[in-house]
Design a protein with these regions (language model features):
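Basic nucleic-acid-binding interfaces
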Residues: 2-188
Length: 188
């Protein structure tokens, strides 16, 4: 059985479906957060980059806000905060704050699975076949927030000068993450 959660973003109501197991997992996280809320002071700000499978141009500009609203609903359901979302037909950048008790990998997995199901069922994304297995996630100080927000806002203009593969590689290298070229941007 599935539950529906309402999300409002960019003046659009978007219904998102989340399976019962995911709902129970979030309830456990919320209870855990509430239990430790008065004891911990943590700021987690992530810049997450998701790429479509095989870099397909699957996110049409005229419908990207629907996807962004849907993703915002998922973020809200995890008690996260979306500061900015934007991208191009083959990738999405998100700047989010997540609860300290929520592992980034678990969140990204749920974000990709849920949004993938939604996009495949939505006629506005006929070219979408899934997200790439890889993703990039970088932590930042709250003092970097405005700089990253502006960077994400400027995606359309930025990609007139630089291809996504180059941008992606630069982000990864700037964050001192080792790249294995045998697997970099290669989908099975």
């Amino acid at each position: 059985m599935q539950n529906t959660v309402q999300a409002l973003a960019q003046c659009r109501d978007v219904c998102i479906t989340i399976d019962r197991a995911s709902r129970q997992g979030r309830d456990t996280i919320k209870a855990h957060n509430k239990r430790y809320q008065s004891m911990s002071y943590v700021s987690t700000l992530y810049h997450i980059v998701l790429r479509t499978h095989c870099s397909e141009l699957a996110i049409a500009e005229e419908h990207e806000n629907e996807l962004y609203a849907y993703m915002n609903g998922i973020i809200n359901s995890y008690n996260g905060k979306l500061y900015r979302i934007g991208g191009m037909p083959d990738h999405v950048h998100l700047l989010v704050s997540l609860p300290a008790t929520l592992a980034l990998a678990s969140f990204v997995k749920e974000l990709k699975v849920s949004s993938s199901k939604w996009m495949k069922a939505n006629p506005h994304f006929p070219k979408f076949t899934g997200w790439s297995q890889e993703y990039a996630g970088f932590t930042y100080s709250i003092h970097d927030r405005d700089k990253i927000i502006n960077y994400i806002k400027g995606q359309k203009e930025h990609h007139k000068k630089m291809a996504f593969a180059e941008e992606y590689r630069r982000f990864i290298e700037a964050n001192e993450v080792a790249i294995d070229n045998r697997f970099f941007m290669k989908d099975a």
